[in-house]
Amino acid sequence: DGYESTVISHGVDTNFFKPIDVPKPNDAFVVGCVARNQHRKNIPRLMRSFKIFVEENNLTPDDARLLLHMDWVDHMGWNIEHMAKNVYGIEEYLVPPTMGNMEKGEHPDDNGMVDIYNMMDIHALPTGGEGFGIPTVEAMACGKPNVICDYTTSYEIVGADKPECPEKMLLPHGLEGDDNLIETNRGFLVPYKDLMWDTPIRAAPMRALWDEHAAAKAFEHYYKNRDVLKEHSKNARAYAVKHYDWNNSIAPKWKNWLKTVKI
């Protein structure tokens, strides 16, 4: 008959990760991303989405900024400053680095992370695939809506009514397909036009490539509709507290499951 299984997700301390007031660069609209600068996070696609967003809306660095919390010279990824300056021409829009060399431990403490999340208006992740998405949930706990690639676990966190949701078919829309940008009550699910095979050294999964123009439209929607931003922020926080708080949600699930274990 097979094995019975129980899924219990990661959690977050929502009494620690919470909305606070922090200064923002020129009070600009800040698109942020907390991730490792590595292959599957697709950071260049986020940079191009941001470029499209500011160009189509004629925004200056006083109007909008891009905050990339990651090691900007990680050997697993890209040279962020080089890409911003020489490929996309958005170096003036970048918030200065919020951490140094990851391998040397040059990163902020937990309190610093709360400050970083709260500098953002929205959290964006063009990921090619996730096992869960801890920064996504931490951002929600801080009251930040997510604009995230609609692949693997993203729907569960940003789109579903609850984590224990039905499986969702994962199919690309194709290069000529409908953009199908999905607005939820706490963020946007960005469609992916195509998939690529990753290398065997990275376990060879298929990685999604998010639609850069669709993501730019999501940024624009939040920029122009601050009432929606405010409502989604409130909903993101409420969802994180209800479903991902360690004490109120995750720990009770573990306690209930442990009672069923036969030794």
Show the residue positions of the predicted features:
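Carbohydrate-associated surface elements
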Residues: 11
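Conserved donor-binding/catalytic core segment of Leloir-type glycosyltransferases
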Residues: 23-41, 47-50, 67
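Nucleotide-activated donor-binding/catalytic signature segment of Leloir-type glycosyltransferases, i.e.
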Residues: 77-115
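A short alpha->beta transition loop at the rim of the catalytic pocket in nucleotide-sugar-dependent
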Residues: 121, 143-145, 150
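Aromatic "clamp/platform" in nucleotide-sugar-dependent glycosyltransferases that forms part
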Residues: 128
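Short hydrophobic beta-strand element within catalytic cores of glycosyltransferases
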Residues: 145-148, 158-159, 165-177
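A short, well-ordered alpha-helix in the C-terminal region of glycosyltransferases
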Residues: 214, 221, 228-243
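C-terminal alpha-helical cap of glycosyltransferases
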Residues: 225, 246-263
